[in-house]
């Protein structure tokens, strides 16, 4: 019987060495499996996606186009960053008083170094590695300091438990340049004792100089500290008789906070 010519002259058969080497080359790249963990979320890049980044000629041979491949890698990392970067994003926050507020953060959180990540990812795919890249918890979790500037009251939650509370006096609302900023911050360092100074004036003296026993800065020159010169804290004091921006605490409470505050703890300030 007449066998259709197409079957007789199949250009490439399954055991064709060229096809085998193309498959092998393709498999080398698509064997990679890279899992990223962002806080409680994970995402995996594997052969299902990588196979679409490869190019083949009309005979099914893998053509290595480095520019095209690196572009795919860069695009993938950019997409990860858009999805998971938290620095500079606004978060919804549930306050202890029962409100929902939106707080943005220019410092707290994390941000992918896209160039470095793309270079590493490209390397991992080409060496068909099975890796897990973990990034720190990107949400606030259940350990944080809540600074409610409208209530003039703060809370320190550790693993969901309220371990510290205090009234305070924040930046004076009568002066635009003294108002405490809303945002998400984190402790820079702590020092005991310290002298806090305002802006230096033309005659070489400072706008103010205050000696404090407990200094915990978290936003430029703004931080938590004891204010032994105040008799009262909380309420409406901050509206007209507030600080230069700092969170003034009763001395005993400042001592307790100084003792328990951890580096890296998110400090959520809002009105």
Description of each model-found segment:
Residues 1-210, 214, 261-263, 269-271:
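Surface-exposed, secretory/extracytoplasmic low-complexity segments enriched in Ser/Thr/Asn/Gly/Pro
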Residues 214-260, 265-269:
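Active-site scaffold segments
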